[in-house]
Amino acid sequence: MFRFIIIAMLLILYLILMIPVMLILLLISRYNNKLSSTIGQAMVRFIFKIILFIAGTKVEIKGLENIPKDGGVLFVSNHRSYFDILIAYAYTPKELGFISKSEMSKYILLKQWMYIVNCLFLDRKDIKKGMKTIMEAIEKVKSGTSIWICPEGTRLKGDNQKELLEFKEGSFKIAEKAKAPIVPVILNNTGDIFERQFPKIKAVKVGIEYLTPIYMEELPKETVKKIGEYTRELIKDKLV
């Protein structure tokens, strides 16, 4: 419980004290979005690493060599914890943005920081708005920003670490239309940090592993039609 209180206080202080910086970055983004997001992501990466340290989270990283150095990438992972996002930003060596549920856009200050670090808000109830978000993500990937999706659509709860919900196929259009590689990512044991003993935060060892990139143009057409299912099986086979 002590860790939870310290982390909550740190986040609140950060959001309040960094308001002037946030406003400057939002202003910069009107003229140079890349500069704004680069500075913003460096700040977010730093604060997320501090939070993970306070949480006692030890992160084992594998497969960094599988991340293409040039161009935008579509990262696809399982989703067990709020801490998944912290780990992704802290340790992924790419300019990165997440596709988040639209409900997150209701939180003032958090919403602005998410905008700065290239996050997009997906309204799953409105097809037209959802397609607009996917198109924005495609343009970001084409411009060199990588996008991270959790195609289960929600955090999966339960004790079976190898269990996965169905992967929704729609978001995979980002890679297809942007002609970008898909990098499957495995997040192991992240649910043990917080969700299993809410509101306590437990010091645990977790893993993040980047798998071999998938190039859709190299796959059979039938596999491309079910690319979500194909990617899901690759991740499921490696979950521990």
Task: Specify the residue positions occupied by each region the protein language model found.
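N-terminal membrane-anchoring alpha-helices
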Residues: 1-58
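Short, conserved clusters of charged catalytic residues that mark active-site
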Residues: 4, 46, 83, 129-133, ...
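Catalytic core of membrane glycerolipid acyltransferases/transacylases, capturing the structured
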Residues: 22, 26-42, 54, 69-127
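A short, well-structured juxtamembrane/interface segment
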Residues: 50-72
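Generic preference for hydrophobic
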Residues: 61, 75, 98, 149, ...
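Non-catalytic C-terminal accessory region of glycerolipid acyltransferases
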Residues: 131-240
